[in-house]
């Protein structure tokens, strides 16, 4: 259920999140000049655009067209309370039992998750989280239509013909990227940060 780990092994959505929809856009914010991003952009410039969230103009965003795998649970299959109960279960059955016995401060990791909340669910969700407040540590709440309210949302459900046409265009023009051909011509390592974050601690805020 760990977010990055689940993606690495091929799970379509991170952690304990259901698929956003049967068809959706997934967006990733990236830094301009990053070698991996620039290599990707050479092959798929049509998937890249300026980020509207970076005031310095140094970030871009990549939009990936995604179709959920057959039989996937999507966000509309779960109520907000059902999703919250999954988070609670993982916290109790996975995070807490996996805490190292050497931890003397009673500090644990947590299950981070974004819960999609319909208009009629808000009061119940607030009461539920307060009742179980010692269980939740990193839960975000998003309005059901939040993916349409916020520009370049990380996940956006495809709901219109124009959006589906964009999905098809992104997919049809996608070019496979062979990352084995990527190599750095300049070392961009920030040595101060590398030293500061060595030996199991990090001084960089």
What are these regions (language model features)?
Residues 1, 8-193:
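Catalytic alpha/beta core of large soluble enzyme barrels
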Residues 188-205:
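Short acidic, low-complexity intrinsically disordered linear motifs used
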């Amino acid at each position: 259920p760990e977010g990055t780990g689940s993606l690495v092994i091929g799970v379509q959505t991170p952690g304990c999140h259901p698929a956003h929809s049967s068809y959706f856009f997934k967006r990733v914010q990236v830094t301009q000049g990053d070698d991996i991003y620039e290599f990707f952009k050479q092959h798929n410039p049509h998937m890249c655009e300026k980020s509207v969230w970076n005031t310095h103009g140094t970030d871009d965003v990549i939009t990936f067209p995604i179709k959920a795998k057959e039989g996937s649970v999507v966000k509309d299959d779960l109520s907000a309370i059902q999703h919250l109960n999954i988070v609670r279960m993982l916290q109790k059955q996975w995070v807490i039992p996996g805490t190292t016995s050497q931890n003397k401060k009673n500090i644990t990791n947590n299950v981070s998750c974004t819960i999609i909340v319909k208009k009629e669910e808000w009061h119940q969700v607030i009461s539920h989280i307060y009742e179980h407040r010692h269980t939740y540590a990193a839960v975000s709440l998003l309005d059901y239509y939040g993916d349409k309210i916020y520009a370049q949302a990380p996940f956006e459900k495809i709901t219109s013909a124009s959006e589906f046409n964009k999905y098809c265009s992104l997919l049809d023009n996608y070019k496979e990227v062979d990352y084995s051909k990527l190599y750095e011509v300049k070392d961009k390592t920030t040595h101060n940060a590398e030293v500061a974050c060595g030996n199991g601690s990090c001084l960089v805020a």
